[in-house]
UniProtKB/Swiss-Prot annotation:
Residues 348-357 have a biased composition (Polar residues). This is Putative uncharacterized protein DDB_G0286333. Residues 1-29, 63-100, 135-194, 307-374, 430-471, 492-539, 594-614 are annotated as: Disordered. Residues 1-10, 63-79, 137-182, 309-347, 431-459, 496-539, 597-613 have a biased composition (Low complexity).
Length: 621
């Protein structure tokens, strides 16, 4: 019996050994199929893998974990085809053609729910779903669903570690989960037909042309929408004011006319906007008087306002009275030759023009009375009238001012440089008789005539009252810093009378001593020196420097004669080229200061031209 049992056991062992060999062959075949499937998958084609080697231990089949070289870059995703390069759509052109049915403008992607994948397809074609869900139940349901999905995925991972499934999806899931490839669905919204991806949440019927990356939707606002929010400021660079003819010829077009039209439009546009918002405009409005423009062809302009008209009449009356007084005194004391000399001297004085005219402005048509091409100036209006209030400006010479459009018919962009009428504050104008005295001394041979001429010239200089260009009529006419100079000027008549008596005595002595030639010449020279000292040489006829410029509204200290450091109380620069015109001080040639009075002889006043390099200061009130 024992032997029979041993034989039976041996037979059973042989059967088992035979069955074991058969099982090993079957398992080897299965392993070959496993490797073939992996080689066919896109994962094996793209990256080299280390395939697991199944081991048999106690009839339990186990596998080693998958390892790959891509474990350091978990963001890469496999695909069956090459993806088309993404085209970033311009966010300022509005939505694409298939999205016009939705509201405009598009909402950026950060406003969408991250877990709702339908927002990524087609912008706002969201199929009856809300952009912002404030319902707690919906949020909880979404979270629960996500948690359930995660739990299921973890269970599947554990099962895959224990049991090898030979389908492609389980292989990919095992590979993905073991290498931490957890890709969210909202990171990529493009169409993909890869069978190894979870593509249930993607719309496969969507056109590829309308595919957009959700990250590019952060600035999807139209340019029209932005234009309503952002202010638009049109500025003109000051460097564009260089209107050289060479530059214009190189460009091939008339850039000066374009610049003129632009500035003209800017002035009118800001005028309209300022009127609409009831703001004071910084641009003057000068009404053109067509009749005066036809009568005056010499480019003599005046700023016309209510008080300037009164000041014009007052100054003209003062000039007429002064001329009448001079003529009466000259007729009583002078001969015919002396009268001729006095007439010549009177003709040399500067007078303002009696006619008024407005600032001309370039017009598109011939009718200058149209409202579009004319302006009106008013009292207390900001702009130029604020600087020319209560002051006479006569014979403004615009010949040296560059105007755009050719000639003097255009708007003057720049500051005026020449004023023929002296408008310096408290400026005295006397007849400069130096040339006349020299001519009389050289031409006349009679000693008595020479003496009479000199005496008459002294009378004309002493009796002529100063013409004051009055800027502030309500303020004291004689400031403290000029009292001494005014007192000297007021005592000129008595001083000159004494000089006349001395001259007559000298003439009598010369006639009695029969030394007419020598002594009279000496006396003439002395008289000429007296005349030179009595006459303030504000206007130099030899050099034709008869241009005195305006002072600032408030006297300030100025060290440079070419530039003013005054700050305007209005919100604009004095040197703005768009102001018509800017009469800020450019150059003041002959100011009067007490420091220029000769301390030795109180009868004489040193001419300012004798010390041009000496600095001066304005008088403060």
């Amino acid at each position: 019996m024992i032997e029979d049992n041993i034989n039976n056991n041996e037979n059973e062992n042989e059967d088992k050994n035979g069955n074991g060999n058969e099982n090993e062959n079957d398992k080897n075949n299965k392993n070959n199929k496993f490797e073939a499937l992996l080689m066919q998958s896109p994962i094996s084609q793209s990256t080299p893998f280390i395939f697991p080697s199944p081991k048999i231990n106690s009839n339990i089949l186990t596998t080693e974990p998958l390892t790959t070289q891509l474990s350091s870059s978990p963001t890469t995703t496999p695909s069956l085809k090459k993806r088309k390069p993404k085209t970033v759509r311009n966010p300022f052109i509005g939505p694409s053609s298939n999205k016009t049915k939705s509201n405009f403008p598009e909402f950026p992607s950060w406003t969408f729910e991250k877990n709702n994948n339908d927002f990524c397809q087609g912008g706002l074609s969201i199929k009856n779903k809300h952009l912002f869900t404030f319902d707690d139940n919906n949020n909880n349901n979404n979270n629960n669903n996500n948690n359930n999905n995660n739990n299921n995925n973890n269970n599947n991972n554990n099962n895959n570690n224990l049991n090898i499934n030979f389908n492609n999806r389980s292989i990919y899931n095992n590979y993905k989960n073991n290498n931490n490839f957890n890709q969210s669905d909202d990171e990529d919204c493009e169409k993909d037909n890869d069978r190894f991806l979870n593509s249930e949440n993607f719309d496969e019927e969507e056109d590829e042309e309308d595919e957009d990356d959700c990250t590019n939707k952060n600035f999807e606002w139209s340019i029209d929408m932005l234009a309503t929010i952002m202010p638009v400021n049109i500025t003109l660079d000051n460097q564009q004011n260089n209107l050289n003819s060479t530059n214009n010829s190189d460009n091939g077009y008339e850039s000066s006319t374009e610049l003129f039209e632009f500035k003209k439009w800017k002035i009118e546009d800001e005028k309209k906007s300022n009127d609409y918002f009831s703001r004071p405009t910084i641009y003057p409005h000068v009404k053109i008087n067509n009749q005066n423009n036809q009568n005056n062809q010499n480019n003599s302009f005046l700023f016309k306002s209510s008080k300037t008209n009164q000041s014009i009449q007052q100054l003209q009356q003062q000039q007429q009275q002064q001329q009448q007084q001079q003529q009466q005194q000259n007729n009583n004391d002078n001969n015919n030759n002396n009268n001729n000399n006095n007439n010549n001297n009177n003709n040399s004085t500067l007078t303002s023009s009696n006619s008024l005219s407005g600032i001309k402005r370039k017009s598109s048509g011939s009718n200058y009375n149209s409202e579009d091409d004319t302006y009106s100036i008013e009292k207390d209006q900001t702009g130029v009238s604020a600087f020319v209030d209560d002051i006479l400006i006569g014979d403004i010479n615009l010949s040296s001012i560059s105007s755009i459009g050719g000639g003097n018919s255009g708007i003057v962009f720049g500051r005026p440089t020449i004023f023929n009428t002296p408008t310096h504050f408290n400026t005295y104008i006397y007849n400069n008789n130096n040339n006349n005295n020299n001519n009389n001394n050289n031409n006349n041979n009679n000693n008595n005539n020479n003496n009479n001429n000199n005496n008459n010239n002294n009378n004309s200089g002493s009796n002529s009252k100063p013409i004051i260009a009055k800027r502030f009529p309500n303020r004291p006419q004689f400031p403290e810093c000029l009292e001494e100079s005014f007192s000297i000027n007021l005592n000129k008549q008595s001083q000159n009378n004494n000089n006349n008596n001395n001259n007559n005595n000298n003439n009598n002595n010369n006639n009695n001593n029969n030394n007419n030639n020598n002594n009279n010449n000496n006396n003439n020279n002395n008289n000429n020196n007296n005349n030179n000292n009595n006459n303030i040489k504000i206007i130099n006829n030899n050099n034709n420097d008869s241009d005195i410029f305006l002072t600032p509204m408030t006297p300030v200290k100025i060290t440079s004669v070419t530039k003013s450091t005054r700050k305007s109380k209005y919100n604009f620069h004095v040197t703005d080229p768009l102001i018509l015109p800017d009469i800020s001080p450019i150059k003041i040639k002959h100011p009067i200061t007490p420091t220029q009075i000769n301390s030795n002889s109180s009868n004489n006043i040193v001419s300012p031209s004798s010390s041009p390099s000496k600095k001066f200061e304005y008088c403060k009130f």
